[in-house]
Amino acid sequence: NFVENDYVFVDNGYSTNTGSWSVYQKNDATAYKRNFDKLFDQQIIDGGKFGSSIVASTQGVDVAVGTPGVNKVNIYRKRTTLSSLQIRNEITLDYGNTAADDNFGFSLAMTDDGGALFVSAPNTGDIIKLTLSATFRTFTRGQLITGGDTGATGRVLFSDPNNDYLIVKNTGSTDFINEGINADDSSSIVTVTKVEGADGLNQGQVSWITRDTSFNYGTQQTITAPSLDRGGLFGFDMAVDSTGEYLVISAPGGPDDSTFLNQGTVYVYKYSADSSSLDYTLHQTLTPSNQEVGSRFGESVDISSDGTTIVVGSTTATDSTTSTAGRVHVFRRTGSTFAEDEILIDTTTESDTRFGTSVQISSTGKDLLIGAPNETSNEANSGAV
């Protein structure tokens, strides 16, 4: 990510897969040098994978770093002290007591001013939606719930403000909470009914996190996959326009039906300050015009700063001559509706180049970078952009 005059670079940490990141600042018109110390997760946890995802505000004041191996995101703020620039850890966002492989922090997106941060957990799964049939005290995120004749155990992922429903992650292998549940203190019992969701392993979800004027961060909304597809990987990649009006979330692993298995879907959410709920609501669902099983539409996504152009990578799509070479779909907005305007393919005749694995569009939408990491340009799988 280029941030004003700063460049963020990721490489290895001290221990196995702990990860690190460094900031480079341009010292003249052409050269970059590392201007800050290399940063590591202060806990230095094996397998934390600190630096798997990085996002920054336009001026480089706010920087968020994902550590999905331990379901965590660190937020840093750049401050000027005694004429020197420093980046310090501002806050750590913990997902709670969830499965180690939920990968909270796998993908990040941030508005230009740094006031809104979006964090995905694409491997969250086994979600059950429960409707309460009796009054019960407020549940808290991460709270342990046990009970039911199956003996299943889960933790609360989300409860709406009125406690009308809960979304619970079941930690059992196959059983689900289906009758009574009780809280940790076992003093209150409530009957619940499962109304949707079953064994949706790797459905995924996205957290919208906001910052107040005192630089305190809190979860404003949890966005779950509109389609509870097993393996959908909702939140695999994300992008947001400069103001936060349009939020793009991909689910390259869905749907889980046999017709277009793993074709992939991209969801466009819209926020309006005039809305009574002040939440992001599903605005439009994007699918490729040339539908194909296993094309993984949504492996990568980006949106122009003005919110008029969306680009979507479909890495294992097949063109007319080359198998699984990959494609990139360009959607442009007219009024409030996005429509597919262009399909880009790799100019090589190779197969499996993974064209579209990464995409980056300029702020104006006039320039587009596309990664093809498996392309054989000089050596096998040496990659190209």
Feature map (PLM): residue ranges:
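Conserved beta-strand/short-helix segments
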Residues: N1-G125, D199-V385
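Autoprocessing Asn-cyclization modules and mimics
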Residues: N1-S15, W21-V23, G125-I177, D185-G200
